[in-house]
Amino acid sequence: MDYTIETLARGTKVCINSTHRFGTDAFLLSDFCGLKYAQTALDIGSGCGIIPLRWKDRGHKGMAVALEIDADGTALTNESIKLNGFDNMLAVNHDIRSWETDMQFDVITCNPPYFTAGKPKDDEKKASFRHQLTLTDNDVAAAAYRLLKDNGKLCICQRPSQLAAVIYAMKSNRIEPKVIRFVRQRKDSPHPWLVLVDGRKNGGVSLTVMPDLIMENDQGGFSDEVLKIYN
């Protein structure tokens, strides 16, 4: 299997190829979920395993599962696990809708491809291996409800245009949206390009909208908050 290696801030190696790579949104989501040191975590549609690998890079010691429907993505994740010598991370090649496990998780994340309808472009066809077009927001929320501990957390990043669908899917599956944060490229950008949503299984009804996360400073470099997230 051909791949190249990216190295994260604290030395964790991530195997990637032309289909299974990672971008800024994976870093933002991995940070936003606030995973604690010993919690159990699942990443749905994990691709090359970047989100669980990032958790490990930041010192996470609990069990982390990278679930991916495409066997090539799972193979890349397994290579990364071997290279880094992680014994508390598991790569699973399966469809989340039919995956059965005795594990219950404190935190579940999902970073879906950002298209939902119409004819996908060639690159989008490659990306759809991960879990969409066929996996819906409702599928993710239903699986999360089944696999989360009580009051466990489901964190999703999506395009802002899909926010209503994410909230509806969560509430339909007894996951209460608790925190929303929009991401803007610059503080004067007219519209956000991403939204991060945190929902709790069987949570109470209350919602916090955090201040927008701004990607760039006035000089065009990364903002202080983004630099902290990357490092």
Task: Please give the residue ranges for each predicted region.
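Short, well-ordered coil/turn elements that cap or connect secondary structure elements
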Residues: 9, 36, 59-61, 86, ...
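Conserved Class I SAM-dependent methyltransferase catalytic core
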Residues: 19-22, 136-185, 190-192
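Residue-level signal for inorganic ion chemistry
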Residues: 29, 111, 140, 199
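SAM/dcSAM-binding transferase cores
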Residues: 188-231
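Conserved beta-strand segments of alpha/beta enzyme cores
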Residues: 13, 63, 88-90, 176-179
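SAM-dependent Rossmann-like transferase core, predominantly class I methyltransferases
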Residues: 2-40, 46-48, 53-54, 212
